[in-house]
Amino acid sequence: MQKLFREIGFACLLLVLALLLVFSLFWALSIGTVKLPVREIYETVLAQFTSGEPITAPGQGPVHDIVWLLRLPRVILASLVGCGLAVCGVIMQAIVKNPLADPYILGISSGASLGATSAILLGICVSLGPNFVGIAAFIGAFAISLAVLFISNLGGRSNSMKLLLAGMALSAVCGAFSSFIVYFANNKEGMQTIAYWMMGSLAGAKWGELAIIAPIIMASVIFFWTQSRVLNLMLLGDESAITMGTDLHAYRQWYLLISSLIVGFAVYAAGMIGFVGLIIPHVIRMFTGPDHKRLIPVSSLTGAIFLVICDGLCRIIIPHTELPIGILISMIGAPSFIYLMIKKTYGFGGND
C-alpha cells in the first residue's frame, strides 16, 4: 500500500510539473517588447495548427509572426535545451559518481564551444553538410569528455577531485584556443556571432533547428530513462555491479557519447549555458532520492521549466534590452556551485 501511495504521489508530481511547463511556456510567449494576451496566443497557435499552412510561412499578421515565427521556436528550444542539459547533468554525475559533475564544469561545454567556434570561423567540418556546426560541437564535446576521463585516471584510480581539476583545466585550454581563433580570424560577422553566442542566447531559434534538435534530445532522454537500473548500479560501484552481472565500462562509453551529442547540439543552438546540469539534478535529488527512474523525468521537466523562465526573465529584466541567458544562469549557478562545494553533505544520498 505504501508503494502504491508513492507511485500515485510521483504521478501527481509529474502532472504538476507538466502543467507548470505549459504555464511557463504561455507566460514566456506573452512577454517581451510587445506584450500579448494569453488568449490571443492560444488562438494564434490553434489557428496555425488548423490552417494547414507551412509552419514557417510569414505574412499572416504581426501577432502570428511574433508568436509563431519568433517566440514559439524560442520557448520550445529553451525547454529542450533545459531538459537536455539537466538530464546530461544527471548522467555525468552517475558516470563519475560525483554530485558536483556537470557538462559545463567538466569542460564538455567548452569542448563543444571550441568545436563550434572552429566550424564557424575556420570552416572546419563544412564538408559534412548544412549542420556542420552542430557536428563540430558534438566532436569537440566528445573529445573533451574522453580527455577528462583519461587525464583523471592517470597515476591511479580516478576520484572526484581529479575529475573536477581535469575538467577545469581542459575548460581553460578550450577557452584559450577559442579566444586564439577569434583573435586571429579575419571574419567580422563570424566574430560578432561568436561573441554573443559565447554568452548564451536563444534569440536565433528557428523551426529548422528544432526539427533536428528535438528528436535527438527527446530520444536521448527516453533512452536514459530506460537505463535507470544501470545508472543506479553505477552509484554502487563497479565491483557491486559485476557481482550483479553487469560490466559498466561499455555503458559509460555509450552514455558519454550520447551525453556529448546532447551537449554539442545544445551549445550549437543556444551557446554556452552552464550550471543547469549541476543545479537541477542536485535540487531534485533532495526530493526524489537517487533512484534514476524518478530522478530523470523530474529533472527533465524541471530543467525545461527553469530555462524557459530564465529566458523570459532575460527579456524583461532590462527594459528594451535582452540580457544573454548565459549571464543570468551563471549568476544563479556559480553561487550554487560554491555552496555545494563547501557543504558537508552533498552526496547522492546525503552522506558522501
Each model region followed by its residue ranges:
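Alpha-helical transmembrane segments in inner-membrane proteins
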Residues: 1-352
